[in-house]
Every structure is written in structure tokens, then in C-alpha cells.
Amino acid sequence: MKTFKFFTALFATAILTACTLDMERPTNVQYIDKTDVIWQQHLQKIQKIQSYQAKGQIGYISPTERFSSRFEWQYQNPKSYTLKLYSLISKSTLWIQMHQSGMTISDNNGNQQSAANAKLLLQEIIGMDVPLEHLAYWLKGQPAMNADYQVGTNHLLGAFTYHVDGSQWTADYLTYHSNNSMPENILLKNDSTKQTLKIRVDEWIY
């Protein structure tokens, strides 16, 4: 199968940006009880958000990849979502589309590949081992039912630990938008696979 190495070829101009991102987890953070009334009300609110859009910037570091990109995320359900990654400098664009038969990854140069196994396709084409099906919930600050999570003193999700495919992901919610209490800056890390994502959401639509 012929692959197209998107980030190496098209996002080389963004590498220096990713190198400067602060990828360390915050320390000495205070948390409150999960039974907090304001938090429980907020949790019910975000659980009702089934489809939404988010726009912003993502920085990614792994042993083999390092990049920074603008992104647009459109989510309807676990079998229907799109992640658009693009560079304002090079005009390059990548679309990751999940559909009923699997995943399709394409770019603005006409390259396209599809596979039933979304996880393997994402690893092969982009070099990322990120569970996008879980990212849909992590992005809006909704912890999984079986996740070990903490609530911040702002009465919003502060951090969580979640096991996926035998490895452990951690998330720290650094800041929230004041107008809608939706996440603004998120730090995701997987020490097992040595992956780090820094996400900044500039706009929420739901």
C-alpha cells in the first residue's frame, strides 16, 4: 500500500512551533469533591451535547513525529466525525473522516486512503496513536464513567487518568472559556507511548 507521509512533507514549517510548546503537567493543583453540585450540573450539561464543532490549534510530540497545526473538529457520533488539520503557512490540509465502513484520510493534493481499522490507518499515515473515539469526549471535558478524574476549584473537570488499549492517558484541563465553561487549553499525555498533545480550542459550536 502506498502511503503519504503528511506531517513530514507538508507541516515541516510548523515543527519549530511545536518545539516551543510547554508539555509538562501542572503541579500542586488543588481539587474538590466529585459530588460538588456545580460540577454535577455542568457534567449533565456537557453529557447532553451530542454533536458539536471545535476549532483551534494542536501541538503533537512523539518519538517519531513533532508538529503544530490548526484544526477543525466536527463530531456527530462515534461513526461520523471529521478532523481537519491545516497549515496557515503552507496552505496544506489533511482530512480524517470516520464513517460507517471505517476511516478515510485524504489531503489537498489528491492523496486518499481508507481502511476499516481506523487505529491502524491513523498510525500508518500520520504516525499518531491517539484514540479519536475517546477524544470526542475528552475535548469537551467529559470524563468516562470508569475514569479516575478530579474536579478543579473552578467546579470543572481538572484532570483524569484513563486506560485505553493497555496504556494510560492523562489529561489536564489548564484553562476554560469564561463565556461557556468549555475547555480552552488541554494537555494530554501517554507516558507508555511517549505521546503528548497540547490542544487549544478557540471556538466552540454546539
Swiss-Prot record:
Monomer. Coiled coil: none annotated. It is a lipid-anchor. This is Outer-membrane lipoprotein LolB. Keywords: Cell outer membrane, Chaperone, Lipoprotein, Membrane, Palmitate, Protein transport, Signal, Transport. One of its GO terms (cellular component) is cell outer membrane. It comes from Haemophilus influenzae (strain PittGG). A lipid is attached at residue 19 (N-palmitoyl cysteine). Belongs to the LolB family. Residues 1-18 form the signal peptide. InterPro entries: LolA/LolB/LppX (IPR029046), OM_lipoprot_LolB (IPR004565). It is found in: Cell outer membrane. Plays a critical role in the incorporation of lipoproteins in the outer membrane after they are released by the LolA protein.
